[in-house]
Amino acid sequence: MKYTDFLAHPDEIIPTIRMMYADYRLKNMEIKDPSVRFCYNMLNRVSRSFAMVIQQLPVELRDATCVFYLILRALDTVEDDMAIPKEVKIPMLRTFHEHLSDRSWKIKCGYGPYVDLMDNYPLVTDVYLRFDEGTKAVIKDITRRMGNGMADFIDLDEVLTIPQYDLYCHYVAGLCGIGMCKLFVDSGLEKEDLVAEEDLANQMGLFLQKNNIVRDYLEDINELPAPRMFWPKEIWGNYAKQLDEFKDPKNLDKAMLCLNHMVTDALRHCEVGLRSLSLLHNPNILRAVLIPQVMGVRTLTLVYNNPEVFRGVVKMRRGETAKIFVTTTSKLSFFRTYLQFANEMEQKCLTEAKNDPMVALTLKRVQGVQAACRAAIVKAEIAEGAKGPSTAMVLAGALLIAALAYFAYVYSAGGTSLKALPLFGVVIILAIGLFGRNLALKTV
C-alpha cells in the first residue's frame, strides 16, 4: 500500500482504517474447532478479499461458503499445477469430487499457501462432512461438473474460439455462482426463482472470470514449466501469430488492440448479469454478491487500454477496495458506484482509445450498462424514498441542531472562537459525528 495515495484520495483513509480493523478481527477470530479454524485461516491466506466478502453473508451460510470455496480452490490448484503430467491430471480432476467423503485423502501439489491447503485438505473434508445432505450434494455436484469441465480443456493446448472461452469460464466460475445460488435458496433465505434463472448467475461468474483472465495475462503466459493460455485465438489471432508476442514491448500497439478487444468481450456479460440482482432479497446475501461485481467492473475499467497489463500487475488501490467494501451497502449505492466506473470507461473510449477499431462496440456495451444502471438507480431511489428518511439522515439532523444549540450557548457565554470552546465539548461533538458517519456507512 502506498501511503502517498491517501494524499490524492483522502476519502479512502477512514474506509482503509475500518477495513484494517475488520481484517484484524477476522484474523483473530476465536474458533475452537481446529478444522474450522484451519479453513478460515487458509481462506484468509488464499483470498483476503473473499474472506471479507464471506463475512457479509448471514452466519448460517458462512461455513458452507468458506468450505465450498476452499474445495474449488483445491480443484483449481490441481488444474493450475503445470508440473502434473496430463495423464495424471485429467483423471484426478474427473474424480476429485469422489474424495469428498474420504477424510484421509490429500495430494502434494501447488505453490505457496496452496501447498498447505493440499497438505491439510483432510481438515477441509472434515468440516464438509458435517454439513446437511442438501449442502453436501450441492457442493459435490458443482465440484464434479467443474472438475470434468476442467479436464475437457486440459487436452487443448489453447482456447480457440469465443464459445470455447465462454464454456471454460462457465466451468471454472459460472458453476460456482450457480452453486452459491442453490445454497442461498436451500438455506431458506432466498426464493426459488433465483435457482430457476441459472443463466443470470452464470453470466455474473463469466464476467468476474474474464476480468481475472484479462488482468493476469503476463502471469499466465510466464507460468513455468508451461504457459497457461486462456485468451481465445479467435480474438488474439487477429493481432499476433503467437499469444506470447504481446509481452514483447515492440508489439505493444498490437497488444493494446487485443487487450481492448478482450475487455469488449467481457463487457457483454455485464448488462445481463446485472438483471440477477433483482432476484436477491436478503440484504446480507445481496451485499456479498454486490461487492465482487463492483470490484469486477472497476478492474475492467483499470485494465482497459492500459499497457501495464503487459508489464506487470494491474490492481485496485487498497484504499479504493476498502471504500467499495464500506460504501456498497445497498442496490442504490451499488448502481451509483457501478455507473461511476462505467462513466470512467466511457471517457477512456472517447479520449485515449478513440482510435481503437473496437471502440464503437465497446461504447455500445458501456452505454448499455450505463442505461441499465440509471434505470436501476431511479427504481432504487423511489424504493428508498418510500421508506422515509433513513436513521443516518435523522441522526445527521439531530447532530446539526445539537451543534447549533451548543455553539449558540458558547457564543452567549462570551466565546468568540474555537479556542473558547471547552475541550470536552469539541471531543463530544467529534465523537458523535464519527459515530453518525459510522452508522451511515454501516459496519463492514
UniProtKB/Swiss-Prot annotation:
Effect of residue 276 to Y: Loss of lycopaoctaene synthase activity
Keywords: Magnesium, Membrane, Metal-binding, NAD, NADP, Transferase, Transmembrane, Transmembrane helix
Main localization (coarse): membrane
GO-annotated cellular components: endoplasmic reticulum membrane
Catalytically driven reaction(s): 2 (2E,6E)-farnesyl diphosphate + NADH + H(+) = squalene + 2 diphosphate + NAD(+); 2 (2E,6E)-farnesyl diphosphate + NADPH + H(+) = squalene + 2 diphosphate + NADP(+); 2 (2E,6E,10E)-geranylgeranyl diphosphate + NADPH + H(+) = all-trans-lycopaoctaene + 2 diphosphate + NADP(+)
Membrane topology of the entry: Multi-pass membrane protein
Molecular function via GO: metal ion binding; squalene synthase [NAD(P)H] activity
Gene Ontology process terms (BP): farnesyl diphosphate metabolic process; sterol biosynthetic process
Gene3D superfamilies reported in the protein's UniProt record: Farnesyl Diphosphate Synthase
SUPFAM superfamilies: Terpenoid synthases
Location(s) in or outside the cell: Membrane
PROSITE patterns: SQUALEN_PHYTOEN_SYN_2
TM ranges: 391-411, 415-435
Co-factor requirement: Mg(2+)
EC numbers on record: 2.5.1.148, 2.5.1.21
Residues holding NADP(+): 48, 73, 215, 315, 317
Organism domain of life: Eukaryota
Amino-acid positions noted as binding Mg(2+) in the UniProt annotation, renumbered to this chain: 76, 79-80
Biological function: Converts the C20 geranylgeranyl diphosphate (GGPP) to the C40 lycopaoctaene, the first committed intermediate in the production of lycopadiene. Converts farnesyl diphosphate (FPP) into squalene, a precursor for sterol biosynthesis in eukaryotes. Converts with low efficiency the C20 phytyl diphosphate (PPP) to the C40 lycopadiene in vitro. This reaction may not have biological significance in vivo.
NCBIfam families per the UniProt record, alphabetical: squal_synth
Family recorded in the similarity comment: Belongs to the phytoene/squalene synthase family.
Protein name: Lycopaoctaene synthase
